[in-house]
Structure formats: structure tokens, C-alpha cells
């Protein structure tokens, strides 16, 4: 009987909530028309269609009907179909023991089941709530939003991104909240924290989505990547790479190596003094061994020497046979030490010496290896091909020279000094179209007793500046002996703007108008932009070349770690440093990277394979590789992530003291 009653109850429940039966024509007004469902409208709605064409009315009617069936207060309370008392015989319980094994005897005294949304029935004639109204026992404000652990609330201000730093985070805009909460969720659960895993689809569809800078969730920079930094001027395809893309360009590398070799060059078995004050290892830099005293009034020689104070290399200019008569003369060099300009060779010191078996004046300046003078570069001075005609200097190069010399004169004149020497043989060409004024402080010491005003000396600098440009444009060192012919040649070769600028400089001593370097720079301001743009392009090129060497230093450090760990003879008998563990993987990984052979047994020398393996090791990727021992008896399948972890743990073990390493 119990079984029959239970099955009947379940059958009634299934009929109450199951699929509706087929309705007849009398219920057609409560049935939604199929044309509305399929096409959105019914063309026979006004022509006698008996079905309902209002979907909202049908849904509301169906929901109210189902609520009456499921949440009726007159529904009978749930009671078990079979109740066993404590005094029942075992025989009567044996038939239903298996079915009732999970029901506690205390269930008989339990209160009848009622939905929480329905209040208890009272004797009062007026009910407290309407039967069809649901009062939820919880609200949205009481449900705390999921926030991942470790989420820093300090980033909420940056996530808001509206620039109002003074607005509290509880009242500011939250890009992860889908809709405003009318139940005051901020007051119910405390400060609102942004949920990075929530998506505001409604705001995205309405065009109001807010994407802030999520600095708290950014991945770390992948330093193992070779980022191609511009400019790019190669003609290879997108998938093609060559070895030169990973290192410095050959011309730049050769130039820097030659400069390094010239800096470290020594001259054994020389007759030069071994020590000049605090300098040693002197090497002569003059190409012409004939004495020339036309510029300074004394024969001068240039040497490269190394300082005993800081170990750096400097250029020493020696004035032979100079006798210092006034101590204040050499003190004038102190003002030149404060001149710091990229177009002026820096002066560091000046002193007298008898190391050359005479009385000499020594000037200490910066050393620029493999530098030439403008006379050697353009005027054929020191050229072994004496019969070859000098090449014409392009106007753009001359404008570059004028810009750099004007920059140097502006810095010198601003320091209340005068260059006094602007000669092709005393201007260094240290790079491609890169010049520096040299030997500027010498005349202040040599001609200290000659009294000339500073304004007159600065005007003379402008005249010497103009004569230098005319000399370079004519490609003749003695062209200024005939100024009229020189200017005719200069006018035919260059534009009127350059000619007018040179005329203005040559008339620098005339007092018809004010002339200084600032006025000259203002007059050539249009051409300064071209020179400045060229300097920016050179800076971009050097930055691009430098970026190629950025990752090479990282790979060297990685290979250094590998060699620190692999095959250490002092730990051969240490059980904690056995090569049967993770360090054995590193040993055969080194063979996998550097000691591969082809099918014929010949060594494989593949730089691309080495760089690829080391980059993957540094990144710790999940890619797995097969490592085979040297005797080909063991095979291991490991990932780069496991190899990186083994390398780091082994290297950290090396840094520990020997006592702690034995304990671990």
C-alpha cells in the first residue's frame, strides 16, 4: 500500500509540472499563434485567426498559473509515506528496510514544509501578505562580489582613469560594475572592489564600455625577445633573418675595434720619456715630423698618454722651448676647464715640464682615437697621393661644419672667452662629419702679455670662421692670399644663402653694425633644422644598433650560469651534487645545444639553433625536448621550464656556504 501511495503521489507531481496536454479549439485564445513565433506577426490576425497574438499576455498568464500550482498555500504538507515506530516488529520492517535506511525516525516530528516566501497561516481574517507576491529573503546587496586573492585595491584609482585622484574609490566610476545598484550595495558590503573577471556586455553594446590601463594585471616584459627597433633599411623578406641582424653592423664594429686598438697601441724602444708628470706610455700622433711654428709661435707635438691617476688616455700637446714668465698665464686655463660643449675638445690641465730635456709647456686634452684634422681630410695635408685633386665638399656638409663651429663659439663666447684659433689644421674630425674645435686655450697662455679686448678677439673669431669656410669651399689651403679670386670660386660653387653668410662673417671686424655669434645663429636658423634632423637620424641609428647588443649580454650571463654548474670537479664525490639528478639534465642539455652532430657525424655549427635554445631556456617555455645521454643508453623528455628551474636551483646552491649545502 505504501508503495502504491508513493507512486501515486509522484505521478500527481509529474502531471502538475509536466508538459501541457494538447488543447482543443476552446482554448485557442490562450495559445500563442505559431505565425507570431516564426514570422513575428500573423497576417490572419484581423481575418478570423482564433489564436492569441499577444506574447506578453500568454507568458503572464502561464506564469501566474504555474505560480498557483507550485506555490499554493493550500498545498498539503510533506509527510513520509511510511512511518515506522519504535515498537514495530522486525518482520514488518524487513520489507522496507532498504528503502527507509536513509530516513531518520525524527522526521515524523518535523514541522511541515512551507516555502519561506509564504507567511504562516494565522487566525486573523486579514492576511499579512498576498498569496501571489514573493518577498525574497535575501538581496543583491548581501551577495559579496568575487574578488581574486592578491588583488590590490590601490589600482582602482588607476583603473578609473578619469583624472580625479581626490574622489574616493567607493563613489567613483567602476568599470567592472555592470549596472548601478539601487539597493546601495556599497553601503551594504563596504568598499567596492573591481572585479577583473566581469564583463559589462550591456555597456559594450551601448558604446559606453570603459577600458582603463590595467597596470595591476600586466604581464612582465619578455626580455628574451629580440625586438626589432627601427629604422629598418634592409631588403630581406619578412621571414628571412641573418646573423648580422643580431649583432652590431660590420662597419660600426670595425670602426670601434680600430679605435680600441689605437687607444691601446704602444710604442716600444722609443726615445720618448717614460714618464711626463703623472702620464706614461707616450705614443706620438703627428704625421709630419717637420717642425712647424707658424700657428703658436713655438714648435708643437702631440702625444697619446695614459694617466696614472684614473687610467684613462689623454692627448698631450707639447710646446717645445716655451719658458713661462708669468705664473698668471697658466692660471687662465682654469676658465677653459669649465667649457663643456660637444663641439669643443675639453681641456683638463696645463703644466710645464723638463722631461723632454728642455722647457716645455704641456696641455692635457681629451683623446679621440683615429681622428683627423680638416686639413688632412679636405685640403690634402699629409695625403700620400700628392698629385690627386681634392674632392669638392658638398654644401650640406659645409652647413654641418658651420653649425657645429657656431655651437662651439656660442659656448666659448658665453664663458667670456675667445677661441682665437679656428684653423683647418686644429679642427678635429672625430666621426662622420663630426668636428670639434681643438687647441683653443693655448693662445691665452702663449700671448698672455698681449693686451687685446675680449670684444675684439670675439669679432676676430667671426672673421677666422668665415676664412675657414672659404678655404674649405675652395679646397686650397692658401686661397685667402687672394680673397677676390677665392670669393669668385666660392660664389660659383655654392648658393647665395651660404655666400651671404660667409660675407657677413668676413666683415666681422667692421663696426657698421653689431656682430656677434648669436646674431649669426639667428640668420642661419633655417639650416640649423636640417643639421638637427640629421643628428636625430644618427641617434636613431645608434639606438637601433645598440639594441642588437642588448640581448647578447643576457645570453652571455645565461651561458656563464651553465658553465658554473656543469662538471664541477670538487663536487664529484658529493652526494648532494650528483649528476644523476637535475644537474645531469643540464649537462646533456649543453650537449644538445653546443655539441650536436649531423647524420655523417660532423659537428653542427648553427648559431640560430644556439640562440633559439638559450632564449627558450631563459623564457622557461613549456616546450619539451628529447635529451639523449652521451652513451645513448638514456633518453629524457624535459621541458625548458624544468631546465630553467634546475639551473636556478643549482646556481643558488653554489652561492650557499659549504656547510649549509651539505645540510640540504
Curated annotation (Swiss-Prot):
Coiled coil: 526-564
InterPro entries, per the entry: Kinase-like_dom_sf (IPR011009), PAN3 (IPR030844), Pan3_PK (IPR041332), Prot_kinase_dom (IPR000719), Znf_CCCH (IPR000571)
Region (Knob domain) residue spans: 565-664
Biased composition (Polar residues): 74-96
Spans annotated as Pseudokinase domain: 265-525
Location relative to the cell: Cytoplasm
Zinc finger boundaries on the chain: C3H1-type: 27-56
Span list, region Disordered: 1-27, 54-134
Translocase among keywords: no
UniProt KW Lipid metabolism keyword: no
Name of protein: PAN2-PAN3 deadenylation complex subunit PAN3
Organism: Aspergillus niger (strain ATCC MYA-4892 / CBS 513.88 / FGSC A1513)
Amino acid at each position: 500500500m505504501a508503495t502504491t501511495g508513493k507512486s501515486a503521489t509522484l505521478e500527481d507531481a509529474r502531471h502538475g509540472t509536466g508538459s501541457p496536454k494538447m488543447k482543443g479549439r476552446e482554448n485557442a485564445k490562450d495559445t500563442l499563434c505559431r505565425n507570431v513565433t516564426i514570422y513575428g506577426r500573423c497576417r490572419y490576425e484581423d481575418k478570423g485567426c482564433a489564436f492569441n497574438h499577444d506574447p506578453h499576455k500568454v507568458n503572464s498568464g502561464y506564469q501566474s498559473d504555474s505560480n498557483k500550482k507550485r506555490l499554493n498555500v493550500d498545498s498539503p504538507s510533506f509527510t513520509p509515506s511510511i512511518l515506522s515506530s519504535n515498537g514495530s516488529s522486525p518482520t514488518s520492517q524487513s520489507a522496507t528496510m532498504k528503502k527507509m535506511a536513509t530516513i531518520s525516525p525524527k522526521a515524523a516530528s518535523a514541522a511541515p514544509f512551507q516555502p519561506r516566501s509564504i507567511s504562516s497561516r494565522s487566525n486573523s481574517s486579514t492576511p499579512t501578505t498576498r498569496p501571489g507576491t514573493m518577498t525574497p529573503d535575501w538581496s543583491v546587496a548581501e551577495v559579496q562580489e568575487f574578488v581574486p586573492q592578491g588583488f590590490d585595491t590601490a589600482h582602482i584609482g588607476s583603473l578609473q582613469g578619469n583624472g580625479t585622484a581626490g574622489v574616493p574609490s567607493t563613489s567613483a566610476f567602476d568599470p567592472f560594475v555592470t549596472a548601478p545598484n539601487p539597493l546601495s550595495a556599497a553601503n551594504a558590503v563596504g568598499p567596492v572592489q573591481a572585479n577583473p573577471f566581469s564583463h559589462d556586455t550591456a555597456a559594450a553594446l551601448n558604446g559606453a564600455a570603459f577600458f582603463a590601463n590595467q597596470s595591476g594585471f600586466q604581464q612582465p616584459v619578455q626580455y628574451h625577445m629580440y625586438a626589432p627597433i627601427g629604422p629598418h633599411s634592409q631588403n630581406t623578406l619578412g621571414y628571412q633573418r641573418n646573423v648580422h641582424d643580431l649583432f652590431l653592423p660590420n662597419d660600426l664594429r670595425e670602426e670601434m675595434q680600430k679605435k680600441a686598438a689605437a687607444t691601446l697601441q704602444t710604442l716600444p724602444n722609443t726615445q720618448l720619456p717614460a714618464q711626463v708628470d703623472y702620464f706614461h706610455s707616450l705614443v706620438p700622433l703627428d704625421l709630419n715630423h717637420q717642425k712647424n711654428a707658424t700657428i703658436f709661435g713655438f714648435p708643437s707635438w702631440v702625444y697619446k698618454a695614459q694617466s696614472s691617476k684614473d687610467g684613462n688616455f689623454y692627448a698631450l700637446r707639447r710646446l717645445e722651448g716655451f719658458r713661462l714668465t708669468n705664473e698668471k698665464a697658466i692660471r687662465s686655463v682654469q676658465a677653459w676647464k669649465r667649457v663643456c660643449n660637444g663641439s669643443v675638445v675639453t681641456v683638463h690641465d696645463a703644466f710645464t715640464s723638463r722631461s723632454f730635456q728642455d722647457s716645455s709647456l704641456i696641455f692635457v686634452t681629451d683623446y679621440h682615437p683615429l681622428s683627423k684634422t680638416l686639413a688632412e681630410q679636405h685640403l690634402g695635408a699629409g695625403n700620400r697621393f700628392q698629385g690627386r685633386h681634392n674632392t669638392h665638399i658638398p654644401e650640406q656638409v659645409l652647413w654641418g661644419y658651420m653649425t657645429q663651429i657656431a655651437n662651439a663659439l656660442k659656448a666659448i663666447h658665453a664663458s667670456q672667452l675667445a677661441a682665437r684659433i679656428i684653423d683647418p689644421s686644429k679642427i678635429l674630425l672625430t666621426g662622420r662629419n663630426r668636428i670639434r674645435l681643438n687647441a683653443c686655450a693655448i693662445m691665452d697662455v702663449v700671448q698672455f702679455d698681449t693686451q687685446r679686448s675680449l670684444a675684439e678677439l670675439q669679432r676676430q673669431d667671426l672673421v677666422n670662421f668665415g676664412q675657414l669656410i672659404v678655404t674649405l669651399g675652395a679646397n686650397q689651403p692658401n686661397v685667402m692670399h687672394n680673397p677676390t679670386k677665392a670669393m669668385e670660386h666660392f660664389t660659383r660653387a655654392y648658393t647665395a644663402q651660404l655666400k651671404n653668410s660667409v660675407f657677413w662673417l668676413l666683415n666681422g671686424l667692421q663696426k657698421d653694425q653689431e656682430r656677434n655669434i648669436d646674431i649669426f645663429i639667428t640668420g642661419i636658423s633655417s639650416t640649423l633644422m636640417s643639421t638637427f634632423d640629421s643628428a636625430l637620424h644618427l641617434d636613431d641609428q645608434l639606438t637601433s644598433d645598440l639594441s642588437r647588443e642588448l640581448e647578447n649580454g643576457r645570453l652571455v650571463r645565461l651561458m656563464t650560469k651553465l658553465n658554473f654548474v656543469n662538471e664541477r670537479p670538487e663536487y664529484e664525490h658529493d652526494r648532494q651534487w650528483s649528476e644523476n639528478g637535475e644537474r645531469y639534465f643540464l649537462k646533456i642539455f649543453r650537449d644538445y645545444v653546443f655539441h650536436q652532430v649531423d647524420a655523417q657525424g660532423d659537428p653542427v655549427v648553427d648559431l640560430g639553433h644556439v640562440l633559439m635554445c638559450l632564449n627558450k631556456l631563459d623564457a622557461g617555455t613549456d616546450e619539451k625536448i628529447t635529451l639523449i645521454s652521451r652513451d645513448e643508453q638514456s633518453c629524457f623528455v624535459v621541458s625548458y621550464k624544468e631546465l630553467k628551474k634546475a639551473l636556478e636551483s643549482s646556481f643558488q646552491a653554489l652561492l650557499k656556504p659549504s656547510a649549509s649545502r651539505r645540510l640540504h
